[in-house]
């Protein structure tokens, strides 16, 4: 369980943040600022302490759905939405800051970024990283989000943005919501198809990576397709 210490003698979190800076606040205090108010049974600091005590780590917030958040005592629809919005914004800030201007060196670096971004998604997402002639990522594009009737994407959707932005190479990534990273026969067929289509246009397909929350599969590292 997440260990929480509650100190009734502390000043209110907003005042402490103004005086000491956000980095000086505890997780309990930062969450209390987001919640703003408590409920009939608990002061806002007690409520934030209660919520954190039900988590093994802060990362559990990212994995929880709106419905799961609302089931926690004192969390209504509005507060649950605000927490999810905050978590998503932080994820996007970290993803942008970490990789958009970096040169790609290994499949591991790409996989680690995309495991954090896609590992907890309940639907299949296909994302493409487009690179320039200096191997720098200049665009990250979500090509599609899977539905019951559709799996993965057509090469033309991926290559449209490559041609539009004069990409030299690209990396394809998609997640397996089941957590099983082993490629299916459809994954192999798709990889062959997109690699061949890229070659026809003089674009290099550097890799196709499948990710889950904790692991990844790189076709470049583990298959004979590259």
From Swiss-Prot:
Key words, A-Z: Hydrolase, Metal-binding, Metalloprotease, Protease, Zinc
Family designation: Belongs to the UPF0758 family.
GO MF: metal ion binding; metallopeptidase activity
Gene3D superfamilies, sorted: Cytidine Deaminase, domain 2
Any one of the GO BP annotations: proteolysis
Superkingdom, natural source: Bacteria
Cysteines paired by S-S bonds: none
Xref: Pfam families: RadC, UPF0758_N
InterPro entries: MPN (IPR037518), RadC_JAB (IPR025657), RuvA_2-like (IPR010994), UPF0758 (IPR001405), UPF0758_CS (IPR020891), UPF0758_N (IPR046778)
UniProt name for this protein: UPF0758 protein M28_Spy0816
SUPFAM superfamilies listed in its UniProt record: RuvA domain 2-like (SSF47781)
Ranges of residues in domain MPN: 103-225
Organism field: Streptococcus pyogenes serotype M28 (strain MGAS6180)
rRNA-binding among keywords: no
Binding, Zn(2+): 174, 176, 187
Annotated motif JAMM motif, positions: 174-187
